[in-house]
Curated annotation (Swiss-Prot):
Residues 20-55 are annotated as: Disordered. The lineage of its organism: Eukaryota, Metazoa, Ecdysozoa, Arthropoda, Chelicerata. It is found in: Secreted. The presence of a 'disulfide through disulfide knot' structurally defines this protein as a knottin. One of its GO terms (molecular function) is toxin activity. Disulfide bonds join C58-C72, C65-C78, C69-C115, C71-C91. The keyword Signal applies. Residues 23-55 have a biased composition (Basic and acidic residues). GO terms for cellular component: extracellular region. Residues 21-56 form a propeptide. Residues 1-20 form the signal peptide. This is Hainantoxin-XV-4. It comes from Cyriopagopus hainanus (Chinese bird spider). It comes from the Eukaryota.
Length: 117
């Protein structure tokens, strides 16, 4: 019974830590300066003129990309892989926080089962 209480408490702590780190990331993103606030606004306007004619859309999973902003979905990242000595960046779905929590629970349960034997 005590072991179950310890496991549940540790799971709650892990979930709390994971949610607080996401809140810190959101806070940091809110504090970043916008384009209008930067000193190099003229450079950004030139970039907009050049790329203004391009129609932008998101890139699907497992297609090549340059940065995270191009990939479709909230938990999709532009991750680099090395193939034959060349770096290839592909959009990959990382699954988000829920997938990580479920994976942690699965590992915990398997460790408990192995301890009982």
């Amino acid at each position: 019974m005590k072991l179950c209480a310890v496991i549940i408490a540790s799971l709650l702590v892990c979930v709390a830590v994971a949610s607080s780190s996401d809140n810190q990331k959101e806070f940091a993103q809110e504090k970043e300066m916008t384009r209008e606030e930067t000193q190099s606004l003229g450079e950004h306007e030139k970039d907009d003129e050049v790329t203004g004619s391009e129609e932008r859309s998101c890139i699907e999973e497992w297609k090549t990309c340059e940065n995270d902003c191009e990939c479709c979905g909230m938990s999709t990242l532009c991750a680099a892989s090395w193939v034959d000595g060349h770096e290839i960046k592909l959009c990959r779905n990382e699954g988000g926080k829920l997938k990580k929590v479920l994976h942690f629970i699965q590992k915990s349960v398997s460790k408990i089962k192995s301890c009982k034997k």
